[in-house]
Amino acid sequence: MPLVNGGKIADDSFVKLAVDTPLPEGGDILVPAERFLGEADALLKRGGKIGVIWPNNRDIAELVPYLGKIAVVALVFPSFRDGRAYSQARLLRERFSYRGELRATGQVLRDQFVFMLRAGFDAFEVKKAADAEAFAQTVKRYSVFYQPTGDGRLTALHRRMQLRHSEGAGL
């Protein structure tokens, strides 16, 4: 699957492992939540970065003690109608201050890309290369937003207030 990271098509250094797949000695891996929680100590001690595939029906609080040690949290969109991963993303960014890669996986669709960015996602697994190119272009399309969200960008109101303040400071 193509990966869009930071608004660009990127190589994915992570290998997805199933619950019963033998652990490689090194390299970056993505493991399912149940495997990570069951083998956290061993996984965190091995060479290479660790990422966790977190289902949207599992409490994100279970992952909080490990956030400083995890390079990637891949949140799953099992259906385009199921938006629980948006809530998980905002919690990770805003409440738990997670600064690692937040990846959207599963049913990642073009028309939801901007909303995913606003929720705090910075990487996206897409089904087709054409979608990856379209996603990369979407990053450039929107620069100002009205609602505050998990991506850390200033809202239109805050930008306007900063501009007025800087103009007033020069008098």
Where are these regions (language model features)?
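Catalytic cores of alpha/beta
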Residues: 52, 61-65, 110-123
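Structural preference for beta-strand elements that scaffold enzyme active sites
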Residues: 28-30, 49-51, 72-74, 101-103, ...
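Alpha/beta catalytic cores of nucleotide-metabolism and tRNA/nucleoside-modifying enzymes
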Residues: 110-111, 124, 128-171
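Active-site-adjacent beta->alpha loops and helix N-cap segments on the catalytic face
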Residues: 35-42, 80-92, 132-141
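Glycine-rich beta-to-alpha transition loops that act as phosphate-gripper elements at the mouths
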Residues: 99-110
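A positional/architectural concept
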Residues: 11-58
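Glycine/Thr-rich beta-alpha phosphate-binding loop at enzyme active sites
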Residues: 49-92
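Active-site-proximal loop/turn and secondary-structure-junction residues that shape catalytic pockets
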Residues: 35, 56-58, 79, 108, ...
